[in-house]
Design a protein with these regions (language model features):
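N-terminal auxiliary interaction/assembly segments of multi-subunit proteins
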Residues: 1-172
Length: 172
């Protein structure tokens, strides 16, 4: 499968898997998906962001940036049956976000797995209270926002510019 087609599949799989995971595991419906992509220098991010590297036929960074209210709701639902020690809420909240992203991206691998090539994933890296991600040289941000009643999550892919045309569409 060409690399450019694989990127389009990564985007589609990530959106579909995020939507289904939110609905099935947390009973949180995704109202709509908005699109924002481009050759911007700085990406504004929300209160908690989890970044995973996807390697193999295509190398991308995938950053899930959660609004505080949404990550709080996810955290509460994930830890409902756990005694969270006082003062450890932020640690557990970050761990919950990392687990959510890890599960979503892990589930995505079956959607774009090639028989002859493996797919490598990095563990999630958590950014708390960061405000921006600086664009790397020769990279493009492709962003989608999933809106829920509890806030939104931005899903940002960071990939090399040669995979996109001058209008920042995937080159197939």
């Amino acid at each position: 499968m060409p690399t450019r087609k694989l990127i389009a599949e990564v985007v589609a799989a990530t959106l579909a898997r995020t939507r289904s995971y939110f609905e099935e595991e947390f009973a949180i419906g995704v109202a709509d998906v908005s699109q924002d992509r481009g050759d911007i220098d700085m990406l504004d991010i929300h209160d908690l962001t989890a970044i995973v590297g996807v390697g193999g036929p295509v190398n991308l960074l995938v950053a899930f940036s959660f609004e505080q209210r949404l990550v709080d709701t996810l955290f509460q639902r994930m830890t409902a049956d756990i005694d969270v020690p006082a003062g450890e809420e932020d640690v557990y909240r970050s761990a919950a976000a990392a687990e959510i992203v890890n599960t979503i991206i892990g589930n995505c691998t079956s959607d774009f797995q090639q028989q002859d090539r493996g797919i490598a994933l990095t563990p999630p890296v958590i950014l708390n209270k960061a405000k921006h991600l600086q664009r790397m040289k020769n990279a493009v941000f492709v962003s989608r926002t999933l809106n829920t009643e509890f806030g939104c999550v931005d899903i940002n892919l960071v990939g090399p510019t040669e995979l996109f045309d001058d209008s920042l569409n995937y080159v197939k």
